[in-house]
Amino acid sequence: MLVPTVIEQTARGERAYDIYSRLLKDRIIMLSGEINDQMANSIIAQLLFLDAQDNTKDISLYINSPGGVITSGLAIMDTMNFIKSDVSTIAIGMAASMASILLTSGTKGKRFALPNSTVLIHQPLGGAQGQQTDIQIAANEILKSRKKLNQILHETTGQPLDKILKDTERDNYLSAEEAKDYGLIDEILVNQKKD
């Protein structure tokens, strides 16, 4: 992947940053692509760094992801809840599966989506092979994960658990407006221009 470089003029001359490092200076973290352990470690490190730098300022987490590994996503979510800084979440493009959990786990009142964003909620996906007992263990783990994720959705959206169970039975795509009505986000951002 080609990462753009930004040149910044300072009193000491020019300084080149990769775009993600420059955004980090403004307390912006980009979560894009599949959520896995490597991505989670990077996002967690950035959250911890920004919180240690100044825990009175918000951190903006921009999300464009098809989802990914549940344990990796939950590690990011736990860190978002652990740090003192408020974490504002913004869906750009797609916030699917585990990414939708991260979107709705932002600080209440600071969960946003851009107008053409799509949010996908569904039950956890998984597969197993091997001996029957191993398959049963994996199936039980998926059921535990589903219960945990539904509880998170219940707590962050205010929707009844039985509605969430029904709504996540199959892929459930929501527009930004539908995600707002559901309680996954608080507002739809149209533009940042000041009047």
UniProtKB/Swiss-Prot annotation:
Q: Identify the main location.
A: cytoplasm
**Record has Hydrolase as a keyword:** yes
Which molecular-function annotations from GO does this UniProt entry contain? ATP-dependent peptidase activity; ATPase binding; serine-type endopeptidase activity
Its recorded reaction(s) are: Hydrolysis of proteins to small peptides in the presence of ATP and magnesium. alpha-casein is the usual test substrate. In the absence of ATP, only oligopeptides shorter than five residues are hydrolyzed (such as succinyl-Leu-Tyr-|-NHMec, and Leu-Tyr-Leu-|-Tyr-Trp, in which cleavage of the -Tyr-|-Leu- and -Tyr-|-Trp bonds also occurs)
- Per the Swiss-Prot or TrEMBL record, the active site comprises S97, H122
Q: Which GO terms describe its biological process?
A: protein quality control for misfolded or incompletely synthesized proteins
Gene Ontology CC terms, in alphabetical order: cytoplasm; endopeptidase Clp complex
Question: What family name appears in the similarity comment?
Answer: Belongs to the peptidase S14 family.
The record describes the protein's role as: Cleaves peptides in various proteins in a process that requires ATP hydrolysis. Has a chymotrypsin-like activity. Plays a major role in the degradation of misfolded proteins.
| The protein's assembly and partners | Fourteen ClpP subunits assemble into 2 heptameric rings which stack back to back to give a disk-like structure with a central cavity, resembling the structure of eukaryotic proteasomes.
Name used for this protein in its record? ATP-dependent Clp protease proteolytic subunit
The scientific name of the source species is: Lactobacillus gasseri (strain ATCC 33323 / DSM 20243 / BCRC 14619 / CIP 102991 / JCM 1131 / KCTC 3163 / NCIMB 11718 / NCTC 13722 / AM63)
- Gene encoding this polypeptide? clpP
